[in-house]
Amino acid sequence: MLPKFRSRSSIIKNTERISNILSGGKLTVCGSKLGGLYTFEKCTFNKYYSSSQYQHTGRPVGGNIHSSSNQQRQKNSEAPRINEIPPSTSSVEKSTTIPNSSVVLDHLLNEGENTLEEVKPSEIHPHMSWSSKSEGKMFKIPEELLNKLNGFGALEKQKKSFSFFTSASLLHRKITTELVNVLQRSKDQGTKDGRFLLDGAPGSGRSIALIQAELFALSQPNFIVLPVHNCEGWVNSTSSYGYDEQLKLWVQPDLIKGFLTSVMKTNSDKLKKLKTFESHELLQNECIPAGTDLLSFLHKLIASSNAPKSLEIFLQELNNNTKSNSNMKVLLVIDNISILSVVTKYKDKKNNFLPPKDFYFINLLFKYISGSLTFNRGTVLAATSSQPRVSTPSLDIALGVAHRNPYKSSDETILDSLQSVHILNMEPYTLDESRRMMEYLVSSNVCLEKVDNYLQNHVLSGGNPRKFFDACTRLA
């Protein structure tokens, strides 16, 4: 039995829900009417059973699908029993019944009481709120901030999951509130006492938590965000590099300029309000005077040929703007410290793989993580990652999840840098968070199950956000 719909708009709405899930599939809705009820005239699905095309051609008789192909039905004992239309009353073309096609319809449309569950649209708040009272609510990412996140690569890992939805929205979790409290702590507290590392199981939501921290900072008038995402690009030997005799470190000029460019574009409206404290000579014939706005200053630094010097000068001037007489703060975000803790794919002149500490930019990041370099006011927020999967023995020892092997060497830079970092462990979804996410997925037509199945999916996934999403969308 197919479900009975009271209006043409109702049937179209529900067929759209299914066609969205069955990529490549199509439902054609007839306009025939009997007793105020609409029925399917032709349905074509071609995802679940790619070897065949399943078609049903029927007439509106109480919502049933009828077929005149009795022989085909007898050849397939697995096919569901379908009522026969007497030849004298058939007013449609001869139909073909393909095995299991009704099973697909029954599974999608006819489960339980032969009706699709009507779920009210999940409430998505258009304006982000950062108080603890917002926990358990879905918030839409404003378009302006979404473009900034895309601009510095924060959404690379999320593109697949976000592609399911018409707009990008995030669940305000308990960890979200914790991170906001971290960023809002004492106005005079610098990064020396504000170094935090998010750790957790694969799929626990570390990158999403970092994004929410960045969204908060970007929405505030007194935060400069320094985003370091897609850290694999700093170690996979895909960019130019060279040895700097003065620094005694390897330098990646193109990547450094790319980082400075993303900082400039992300914070342009705030940088133009800040001024340089000192004059700087970039070239022999060019001197940038004190009092130059940081946006213009950074633009000239990017155009210069000395990338390491440009980065050093900019960070120095940015720190000058976070002194006690200013309300400006800095948020340094490092997504995937794991990949920065293992040997890179770059090689030296002797064809040996280079450790990350031998690179100027990576070495600089670990100085901020360790607290040997600081901003007067701000936060350093990093996260471990399981993508790509690499063995991180030194990082595991630093995090206390592995014991030091006296017969194997460890990276002392990693161990020292994380010695006094505050570890924030990612927790699984609570039951309330699972239900809220399930409501959002169902109302967005991404999940075909009933909302009440959130308990089952919570158990199957162990509350792991990524596994929960996969469990809810397994029919999609």
Curated annotation (Swiss-Prot):
Reported function: Component of the mitochondrial ribosome (mitoribosome), a dedicated translation machinery responsible for the synthesis of mitochondrial genome-encoded proteins, including at least some of the essential transmembrane subunits of the mitochondrial respiratory chain. The mitoribosomes are attached to the mitochondrial inner membrane and translation products are cotranslationally integrated into the membrane. mS29 binds GTP and is probably an active GTPase. GTP hydrolysis may be linked to subunit association.
GO biological-process terms attached to the record: mitochondrial translation
Protein's cellular compartments: Mitochondrion
Record's signal peptide: none
Subunit structure and binding partners: Component of the mitochondrial small ribosomal subunit (mt-SSU). Mature yeast 74S mitochondrial ribosomes consist of a small (37S) and a large (54S) subunit. The 37S small subunit contains a 15S ribosomal RNA (15S mt-rRNA) and at least 32 different proteins. The 54S large subunit contains a 21S rRNA (21S mt-rRNA) and at least 45 different proteins.
Keywords attached to this entry: ATP-binding, Mitochondrion, Nucleotide-binding, Ribonucleoprotein, Ribosomal protein, Transit peptide
Biased composition range(s): Polar residues: 65-74, 86-97
PANTHER family in alphabetical order: MITOCHONDRIAL 28S RIBOSOMAL PROTEIN S29, SMALL RIBOSOMAL SUBUNIT PROTEIN MS29
Family per record: Belongs to the mitochondrion-specific ribosomal protein mS29 family.
Residues given in the record as ATP binding sites: G200, A201, P202, G203, S204, G205, R206, S207
Entry protein name: Small ribosomal subunit protein mS29
InterPro entries, sorted: Ribosomal_mS29 (IPR019368), Ribosomal_mS29_fun (IPR017082)
Cross-referenced Pfam families: DAP3
One of the record's GO molecular function terms: ATP binding
